[in-house]
């Protein structure tokens, strides 16, 4: 049995009225629902793609204006923390949008991780629909109030050891760390990376992991543990 959509209730939560409600219905339609009800003309995946870009732009603009002295690296990492799946899941929860998701019966039995993904995609798809219907301004008016305040955003910059190391070396030595990645294999033969972090040409730390990004974090963490007395 197909479900009906309470468009007015969703518009009230978004504080936005759609000129083309079909866009909203598409944004709510999970691919699993379309598989069960082929009469659903389109699912939300294309709108998710668009909404992801809209979210990234609005958050980037917000951080750029909020922190005029912040460098590109810290801006990038902070943005990542505000646009990832967990963050989008929280935005969906704040707006109570999850109850409107049109999703297949099988998908409803997924794990919590599956729910996070579905709700995150829903938020992005709705942003895509809002953008197509009304432009960037209403999308911005939805996104920005959901973001943490300035004081709450600041700690996000220091969660990543790479950011903490960069801040430490800039403050104490006025230089940036550099990373060198080498191929590496774990004991079971799985490929990965051996990353070394250098400061002023000196080796400060090393990290070994399956992904380059994780190996860089481990190298930065080791560097901090041996050079920053506060850690």
Swiss-Prot record:
Gene Ontology BP terms: mRNA processing; regulation of gene expression; rRNA processing; tRNA processing
Q: What does the record give as cofactor? A: Mg(2+)
What SUPFAM superfamilies does the annotation carry? dsRNA-binding domain-like (SSF54768), RNase III domain-like (SSF69065)
One GO CC annotation: cytoplasm
Q: Which residues form the RNase III domain?
A: 7-135
**Which PROSITE patterns does UniProt cross-reference here?**
DS_RBD, RNASE_3_1, RNASE_3_2
Gene Ontology MF term list: double-stranded RNA binding; metal ion binding; ribonuclease III activity; rRNA binding
Q: Where in the cell is it found?
A: Cytoplasm
Q: Which residues make up the binding site for Mg(2+)? A: 48, 121, 124
What EC number(s) does this enzyme carry?
3.1.26.3
* Annotated active site: 52, 124
Domain of life the protein comes from: Bacteria
Catalytic reactions on record: Endonucleolytic cleavage to 5'-phosphomonoester
CDD domains to which the protein is assigned, alphabetical: DSRM_RNAse_III_family, RIBOc
In terms of InterPro entries, this protein maps to:
dsRBD_dom (IPR014720), RNase_III (IPR011907), RNase_III_dom (IPR000999), RNase_III_sf (IPR036389)
Which intervals hold domain DRBM? 160-229
Supply the enzyme class, top level.
hydrolase
Which Pfam families does the record match to this protein? dsrm, Ribonucleas_3_3
Keywords of this protein's UniProt record, alphabetized?
Cytoplasm, Endonuclease, Hydrolase, Magnesium, Metal-binding, mRNA processing, Nuclease, RNA-binding, rRNA processing, rRNA-binding, tRNA processing
The record's HAMAP family line, in alphabetical order, gives: RNase_III (MF_00104)
Q: What's its job?
A: Digests double-stranded RNA. Involved in the processing of primary rRNA transcript to yield the immediate precursors to the large and small rRNAs (23S and 16S). Processes some mRNAs, and tRNAs when they are encoded in the rRNA operon. Processes pre-crRNA and tracrRNA of type II CRISPR loci if present in the organism.
| Family, per entry | Belongs to the ribonuclease III family.
Assembly mode: Homodimer.
Name recorded for this polypeptide: Ribonuclease 3
> What species does this protein belong to?
Chlamydia trachomatis serovar L2b (strain UCH-1/proctitis)
Gene behind this protein:
rnc
């Amino acid at each position: 049995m197909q479900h009906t959509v309470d468009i007015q209730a969703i518009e009230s939560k978004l504080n936005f009225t759609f000129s083309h409600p079909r866009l909203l219905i598409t944004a709510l339609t999970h691919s699993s629902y379309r598989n069960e009800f082929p009469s659903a003309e389109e699912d939300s995946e294309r709108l998710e793609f668009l909404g992801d870009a809209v979210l990234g732009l609005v958050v980037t603009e917000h951080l750029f204006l909020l922190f005029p002295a912040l460098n590109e690296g810290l801006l990038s990492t902070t943005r990542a923390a505000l646009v990832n799946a967990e963050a989008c899941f929280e935005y969906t929860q704040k707006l109570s949008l999850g109850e409107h998701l049109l999703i297949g019966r099988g998908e409803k039995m997924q794990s919590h991780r599956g729910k996070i993904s579905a709700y995150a995609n829903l938020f992005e798809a709705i942003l895509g629909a809002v953008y197509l219907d009304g432009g960037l301004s209403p999308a911005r008016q939805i996104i920005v109030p959901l973001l943490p305040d300035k004081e709450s955003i600041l700690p996000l910059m220091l969660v990543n050891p790479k950011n903490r190391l960069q801040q430490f070396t800039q403050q104490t030595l006025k230089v940036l760390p550099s990373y060198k990645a080498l191929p590496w294999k774990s004991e079971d033969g799985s490929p990965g990376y051996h990353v070394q972090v250098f400061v002023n040409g000196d080796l400060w730390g090393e990290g070994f992991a399956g992904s380059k990004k994780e190996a860089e974090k481990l190298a930065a963490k080791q560097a901090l543990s041996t050079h920053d007395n506060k850690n």
